[in-house]
UniProtKB/Swiss-Prot annotation:
Tapetum of anthers. The gene is A9. This is Tapetum-specific protein A9. Pfam families: Tryp_alpha_amyl. InterPro entries: Bifun_inhib/LTP/seed_sf, Bifunc_inhib/LTP/seed_store. Disulfide bonds join 32-70, 42-59, 60-85, 72-92. PANTHER family: BIFUNCTIONAL INHIBITOR_LIPID-TRANSFER PROTEIN_SEED STORAGE 2S ALBUMIN SUPERFAMILY PROTEIN-RELATED, PROTEIN YY1. Keywords: Disulfide bond, Secreted, Signal. It comes from the Eukaryota.
Length: 96
């Protein structure tokens, strides 16, 4: 259950990270933002209390269409936000 809460937080921060990236060309940043926005169909699956946390076909299609670099870059950026915001570091039990 804690993993789902953490994953939901990561997804939210991913969207924020994509809008904050300044080093990526604008077209690429917009593509990543669009890709990650399409991943919203997966959000109900990772929220605390999700009845069936297995991905459905819509989630799988969105994940397949998403550039993997966009996901990884967003997660990397999100991990730096806690330091900048003077918050405890994220401990999600995943290694990126």
């Amino acid at each position: 259950m804690e993993f789902l809460k953490s994953f939901t937080t990561i997804l939210f921060v991913m969207f924020l990270a994509m809008s904050a990236l300044e080093t990526v060309p604008m077209v690429r940043a917009q593509q990543c933002l669009d890709n990650l926005s399409n991943m919203q169909v997966c959000a109900p699956l990772v929220l605390p209390g999700a009845v069936n946390p297995a991905p459905n076909s819509n989630c799988c299609i969105a994940l397949q269409a998403t550039n993997k670099d966009c996901i990884c870059n967003a997660l990397r950026a999100a991990t730096t936000f806690t330091t900048t915001c003077n918050l405890p570091s994220l401990d999600c039990g995943i290694t990126i």
